[in-house]
């Protein structure tokens, strides 16, 4: 069986992404053929900062020795200074993501692994950008769901990067139905669960307390869950968020759907931040990202933890092999 070819996109060049890619290249792997979509000078600078070897190869050349890294070059406008993002390089960051996505959509690649990006630097460079998840969804022309996962729990989000005051208005029947259908399909296809058990959190404290603490559960969530149960989905909820993550309850769920970002993710990150990854469900190819930021204060110092990138790469390879 041929191993999948995956794009490795480091993200913000001034952050820890490039050095994490260099660290990843020190262990040639048998589960995937990785191709970095990055600036070669930045990768060489990262290798020098870490005192590690890197040998950049043609995209189709196999990585056989520590430091071998096939490269699809993405040229930056200015040289990288670790720890200091330059808005002039925003176009290169976006070009790396879009080029990798285009190659996936064309069938030349089977998945994407992404490092952390610096949203402020991209927007300061004159490019409107809210997140890589949204960018890839727009390019593929399909709705997606953001899921974060570690070895303990998988959490999918109905809403993502919204101000808290806007969340309640965004919890609609259509949004919830779409999120749950995408999550259910991904659990079946990507994780091999024929009948996934999906817990759904309520929006309000105590899941609305029978309407006394808000009516979203009664008016929106419960009718949506009943509709999907009629389609054969195994859904639990709506559950109060403050007790849904108890270990004895989590053992009965394959995934948890949270209504908003900070409802579901703090518990996940507390339970295993280093191994956590960000998965985009619903794309025609697997995309898995690290679950940490650019860590500018660590960039170029050789002390950044590669665990999340290693976990993201291993998971993306497994998901790609199932497609």
From Swiss-Prot:
> What is the UniProt remark on how the cofactor binds and its stoichiometry?
Binds 1 divalent metal cation per subunit. Can use ions such as Zn(2+), Mg(2+) or Co(2+).
Enzyme class label:
oxidoreductase
Q: Which residues bind substrate?
A: 133, 269, 278, 287
What cellular component terms from Gene Ontology apply here?
Answer: cytoplasm
- Its signal peptide is none
Checking SUPFAM superfamilies in the record gives: Isocitrate/Isopropylmalate dehydrogenase-like (SSF53659)
Q: Which residues bind a divalent metal cation?
A: 161, 206, 261
Please give a single GO biological process term from the UniProt record: pyridoxine biosynthetic process
Which Enzyme Commission number(s) are listed?
Answer: 1.1.1.262
Q: What more does the entry say?
A: The active site is located at the dimer interface.
For this protein, the record's HAMAP family field holds:
PdxA
| Described purpose of this protein according to its UniProt entry | Catalyzes the NAD(P)-dependent oxidation of 4-(phosphooxy)-L-threonine (HTP) into 2-amino-3-oxo-4-(phosphooxy)butyric acid which spontaneously decarboxylates to form 3-amino-2-oxopropyl phosphate (AHAP).
- Name the UniProt record assigns to this protein: 4-hydroxythreonine-4-phosphate dehydrogenase
Which source organism? Xanthomonas axonopodis pv. citri (strain 306)
The gene name on file is pdxA
């Amino acid at each position: 069986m041929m191993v999948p070819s995956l794009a490795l996109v480091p993200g913000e060049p001034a952050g820890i992404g490039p050095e994490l890619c260099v660290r990843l290249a020190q262990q040639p792997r048998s589960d995937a053929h990785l191709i970095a979509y990055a600036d070669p000078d930045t990768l060489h600078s990262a290798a020098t900062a870490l005192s590690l070897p890197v040998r950049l190869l043609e995209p189709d050349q196999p990585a056989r020795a520590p430091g071998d890294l096939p490269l699809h070059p993405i040229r930056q406008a200015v040289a990288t200074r670790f720890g200091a993002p330059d808005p002039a390089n925003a176009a290169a960051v976006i070009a790396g993501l879009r080029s990798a996505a285009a190659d996936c959509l064309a069938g030349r690649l089977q998945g994407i692994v992404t490092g952390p990006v610096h949203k402020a630097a991209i927007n300061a460079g004159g490019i409107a950008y809210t997140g890589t998840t949204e960018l890839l969804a727009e390019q593929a022309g399909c709705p997606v769901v953001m899921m974060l996962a570690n070895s303990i729990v998988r959490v999918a989000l109905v809403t993502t990067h919204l101000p808290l005051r806007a969340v309640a208005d965004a919890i609609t029947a259509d949004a919830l139905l779409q999120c749950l259908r995408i999550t259910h399909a991904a659990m079946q296809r990507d994780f091999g669960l024929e009948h996934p058990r999906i817990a759904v959190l309520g929006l309000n404290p105590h899941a609305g307390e029978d309407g006394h603490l808000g009516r979203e559960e009664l008016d929106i969530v419960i009718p949506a869950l009943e509709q999907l149960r009629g389609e054969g989905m195994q859904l639990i909820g709506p559950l109060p968020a403050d007790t849904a993550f108890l270990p004895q309850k989590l053992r009965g769920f394959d995934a948890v759907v949270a209504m908003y970002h900070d409802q579901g993710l703090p518990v996940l990150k507390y339970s295993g931040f280093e191994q956590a990854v960000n998965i985009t469900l619903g794309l025609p190819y697997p995309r898995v990202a690290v679950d940490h930021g650019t860590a500018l204060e660590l960039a170029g110092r050789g002390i950044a933890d590669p665990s999340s990138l290693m976990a993201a790469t291993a998971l993306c390879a497994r998901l790609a092999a199932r497609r």
